[in-house]
Amino acid sequence: NVAVIGNNRPKALPVSEIDFSRLSENNPKICTYEAKWVTDSPVYLKTPPVCPADISRELEQELFSIAVKAYNALGCRDYARIDMRMGEDGIPKVLEVNPNPDISQNAGFARSAAADGLDYSRLILEIVRMAHNRYQDSEQ
């Protein structure tokens, strides 16, 4: 997935991925409820997030471009997360645009921001600042 932040010039943050390589062949390569939320489950423990993702610079730039285009096309503002999956044809597919992803301190969005050098306090302040500026602009 790619976290995106900003309004006039949205910025893609480092790509994050879930590593499914430790799952058995019987487990689907999807982030199930158990894999996402049940912290002591074997599936959770075998699907660690990797951020930044270990991908080529070329693929990273392609994912950034797709994410920002999706963000703009759907009228997102302030922040959002774009979930993607690589197709068997090697082409990234957008699965979901989440305009209100989890931004808690241990969530993926904050992890991507931290990988970009934006600590949690600054991330939250930036989101609040953008929303405040939008509100002020709408009052004029």
Segments from the language model and where they lie:
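Phosphate-binding site of ATP-dependent enzymes
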Residues: 1-62, 86-93
